Amino acid sequence: MTSILGISAFYHDSAACIVINGKIVAAAQEERFTRIKHDLSYPKNAINFVLKFANLNLSDLDYIVFFEKPFLKFERLLETYLAFAPKGFFQFTKAMPVWLSEKLFQKNALINHLKNHDKNFKDDKKLFFSEHHLSHAASAFFPSPFEEAVVLTADGVGEGATT
């Protein structure tokens, strides 16, 4: 049995999902528990819900996957700011302190949240970061009945891996 916890957090609409052997077993958005629309916090309640539904603990999981790669997203932001300089300088000066102090090093924050969540969770090698649009595509493809498929993703932001 392969068990995967998917986590989306720290942007908007934080959520958690459990996939076991390629089947979505449970999924929940944090806002359903906190009653905060578009909640961006670490989805502790959603994770508790999906783990309880699947009868698992964090330490039982094979993999934990975060929905994006912060360094790729940071690179895209830098490229965008440079491409439109000097027009975006004010936004750049507002965004960079937050990125340099919090967002860029989300791996450490996630590991701390996971360890606080489950004192038995010790294996941070289970934590992986997926490319943003690959996360979207995987969420459509892997639960589908198809062995091969073309998946189109379209949303407002990502790491810039689209054309």
Tell me the role of every PLM-derived stretch:
Residues 1-163:
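Short acidic/glycine-rich loops and adjacent helix/strand connectors
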